[in-house]
From Swiss-Prot:
Pathway: Pyrimidine metabolism; UMP biosynthesis via de novo pathway; UMP from orotate: step 1/2. Its cofactor is Mg(2+). It holds the Pfam family Pribosyltran. This is Orotate phosphoribosyltransferase. One of its GO terms (biological process) is 'de novo' UMP biosynthetic process. Keywords: Glycosyltransferase, Magnesium, Pyrimidine biosynthesis, Transferase. 5-phospho-alpha-D-ribose 1-diphosphate binds at E110, D111, V112, V113, T114, T115, G116, G117, S118. Catalyzes the transfer of a ribosyl phosphate group from 5-phosphoribose 1-diphosphate to orotate, leading to the formation of orotidine monophosphate (OMP).
Amino acid sequence: MIKEILEKTGALMEGHFILSSGKHSSRYVQCARLFEFPEYGDVVGEELAKLLKKYDVETVVGPAMGGVILSYVVARYLKARSLFAERENGVMKLRRGFFVKPGEKVAVVEDVVTTGGSVKEVIELLKEYGANVVCVGSIIDRSGGKVDFGVPFESLLKLDLPVYDPEDCPLCKQGIPAEKPGSRGLK
């Protein structure tokens, strides 16, 4: 069902992409396209919330941009608070008056996990506040099982999409121009 929603909304894209991790791929998942259609965003959020319900989550936090809408929709179904972390001078922060209390049970959610870099940054940020990060959830896991967050990781769909280091990218070797659709904005 999730893959069909991604295809129907145009979220599953083909081409030559530079991922937020810096790696290259011939396929890209742009979940912002999925969230153009609130009815599909609701389906995805509810399904992910069902996976995370067993963790007794009090607050759901997503990294901007991919986790902003997702954290809201998942939190609504879990009857939890929804926050997002965003970059300030290249560093993940809780801004806009957001906070977590020491010991608060938090789920971190992200639309797509490849290397898990943004999620790991959010987990470290939340630990600085003393939060108890109990799980991570994503719509898509394209890590190939290589990511360890130190807490349970739940995803709605595992996609084995090709990922290349830039120096090994066959698309670069063919001279195909690359597009950088991500939003990580690292310095």
